[in-house]
Amino acid sequence: VISLQLNPSGMEAEFLKCLNLCFGDWGNRQTYHWYFQRKTAYPDADLMVLRKNDELAAGSAITYRKISLPNEAVVTVGIMTGSWTLPKFRGQGFFARIIEESIRLTAEKKGALVLGFGRTENSSFRQFAKAGAALFPTTYLFSTPETKPQAVASKLKREEKSEPVIKKLFERLSTSGVGFLRFAYSSAQEFSAQFIHRPGETEILSDSYGNLGIVEKKAGTNLLQLFLPSADDESGITSALAAFLNHSLENGRKLFLYSTRADVAQVGKNLGLGVKAGFLPALIADESSLRKGLGIDEPLTTKDSSLLALPATPWHLNPWNVHSGDRA
């Protein structure tokens, strides 16, 4: 018998232990608090644990956020995050149950969509496909021992975390996202809570060409949580990403970033970064909220989330512009 418990008390240590068991070095209590317990402008995260015959088997969280659609309408979404199944219980339908419960919880909060983040090599890819999700391609980029420094015209320097600098980052992020589906931040303060006040130490970096970014340090890796080239073409993206790559390598560190953009992925490959294919699944939760956001009059005859990936329909959700640091 599979039982599901929502927001159980006193489970933090056990849930964290399972995350680290299933994902390797997932994080500590500070990481756990940042992802699941911090107060934001959105509804509190929901945690669920699943048991089989009273034995702990799986768990997941749903965090709630807002995204801007290409027409600038804003809708609430639920994000499946930290979803784990203990090894002995894999392949027994727990992840499918987590997806179902995530849709139900998100719809309760009038959330239009359930989103997630994953690599196509993982079993979750097949599970989301089976659940009928629209699957949008993403890329994980990372330096390898073979990645070499690049010739760059300008070195990065560290910026103060001052109000004007944060405002500049927030405004650049807002303008660079126009025309894309993207995570919405209503103020510089909300932006700062997501990108600057993170579990690890963060740095704001810039160069003389106006390239900007935020790096979070984790072990020996610089996580490029926000990447804002001054020019949004191949040349501009190349010079900006090369600067962040060199900055990491010169300091004896690896570089990692995530992107939903094919042009950023191609530049990363050209610079010698390692690449892993990922996916962003989207499932309809509250259809009326999504319909209203998209400005569609006619309801769907069936709640078919795969329509979201079809260019010929008014339900099409593309292109996405999601940064590494958006994903929580």
PLM features: residue spans?
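Conserved acetyl-CoA binding element of GNAT-fold acetyltransferases
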Residues: 74-87, 220-232
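Conserved beta-strand in the GNAT
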Residues: 47-49, 55-65, 79, 84, ...
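Extreme N-terminal starter segment of soluble prokaryotic enzymes
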Residues: 1-2
